[in-house]
Amino acid sequence: MAFPQTIMGKFGWEKLTTTAQKHKLGTRMQIADREFVYSSTGEAITAGKLVMGKAGTAAHQVDLAVSASSAGATTVTLSGSLSVAKDLYKDGFLIFNDVEEEGHMYRVKGNTLVSSATGCVVTIDEEDGLVAAITTSQQVGLYENPYKAGEAHDANDVDHSPLGWTCVDIASGSYGWLCVKGFTTALVDGTPAAGVPLIASNGVDGAVEVYDEDGSVNLSPVGYMGPIAGVAGEYGLIKANIE
């Protein structure tokens, strides 16, 4: 069954939340000049907060050993002993991080269950399969879908890249939309002037602050302040520019 990758929405659809998944994580929605991405939450997040992805399992993300497989194969078998829940990495990514095929990335369709055992089989969601044969020398990493179980951007413990802003309160374990482009409301840290670039705050969870080129806070901009200066601790109009 095919799912649309981009939805043409109506005003207000960005505020819809559900406890059951309605779209593939990462599905895009456009409403006039605003763009959104479909995500789930790992904690309750109120409206206007910047969201980041969760950390995931570091031991699965790099240097996993594999069994040999031919070009065109649609499965990769992990040869090391691991504990992996069934389909934990569905709609996530398999990357080759080192040796020969390094730099390649594949979408994951699903994975088998293993508990302190070898032989986890990862099925890739690409009909042409692997672009080249792999040997036992290759090293891979597994990543869950970045839009799965997001959390408010943590000022003191950044786990992942920023994903977008909530448009309404989203309960823990629920599904909803994050604004990634266009105008939206955001929690403000400090008093950024009108039109200045903004970064994720390093002092207030889920907030944005002014980009400080000459200071110590030189993170990549995630948006721009709107037509008036922001007020510390309040929500202001910003132009999101994450994607």
Residue locations for each model-derived region?
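Short conserved beta-strand and strand-loop elements enriched in small hydrophobics
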Residues: D91-D98
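Extracellular receptor-binding modules and their adjoining Ser/Thr/Gly/Asp/Asn-rich linkers
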Residues: M1-K86, D98-E243
